[in-house]
Regions:
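Extracytoplasmic/lumenal domain signature
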Residues: 1-7, 12-20, 24-69, 74-177
Length: 177
């Protein structure tokens, strides 16, 4: 026997607050919560972002297809990131629970359950995104091997990372205009 709303994703604790999610199917309800770690007092509950009517990545259909946690939640500054499987993580204001951003990926494009972040950048499915706006022109730093095999930080953009994924490895990393 299982609940209609099992705990999903990994719990994250920051500044004495526990953030967690429950629910699988948007039609049954998805719940993202923030509670005091010491008392369990509910600080906020977002139960609306799981029922967003939106275009689907296949065949031009629309459906209720909001946020469902499918990976460990991540706190970066005043943002809570909720990995959602195939899509880019949903972003919430961690102080209020206000839904800020979510977008389904087109078929065969990347999303992921594994998400990590630092500063104003988060990495999801091997791609780095600016936390304010997911923009292919966003400037980012990525760590990669140089021609002599040494790990180095490279200034680039999200779009160039995506472009380079399509190139044969023999061409190396193309970072110019």
């Amino acid at each position: 026997v299982i609940s209609r709303w099992p705990a999903r994703g990994g719990v994250v604790i920051s500044d004495g607050v526990v953030y967690w999610a429950a629910g699988i199917w948007q039609s049954e309800g998805i719940f993202i919560r923030a509670q005091r770690a010491d008392t369990g007092k509910l600080l906020w509950l977002n139960d609306k972002s799981g029922g967003i009517e939106m275009a689907q990545p296949h065949g031009g259909a629309t459906a209720k297809s909001g946020v469902t946690a499918q990976g460990h939640l991540v706190v970066i500054g005043n943002r809570l990131l909720v990995p959602t499987g195939r899509a880019v993580p949903a972003v919430f204001d961690r102080g209020t629970g206000q839904f800020l951003y979510y977008r389904l990926q087109q078929n065969t494009h990347r999303g992921a359950t594994a998400t990590m972040g630092h500063g104003d950048v988060f990495i999801n499915g091997g791609l780095a995104y600016d936390l304010g706006v997911v923009d292919p022109r966003a400037s980012i730093k990525v760590r990669m091997k140089s021609e002599n095999g040494v790990n180095v930080w490279v200034d680039t953009t999200v779009g160039r990372i995506i472009f380079n994924e399509a190139l044969p490895p023999v061409l190396g990393f193309r970072n110019g205009e």
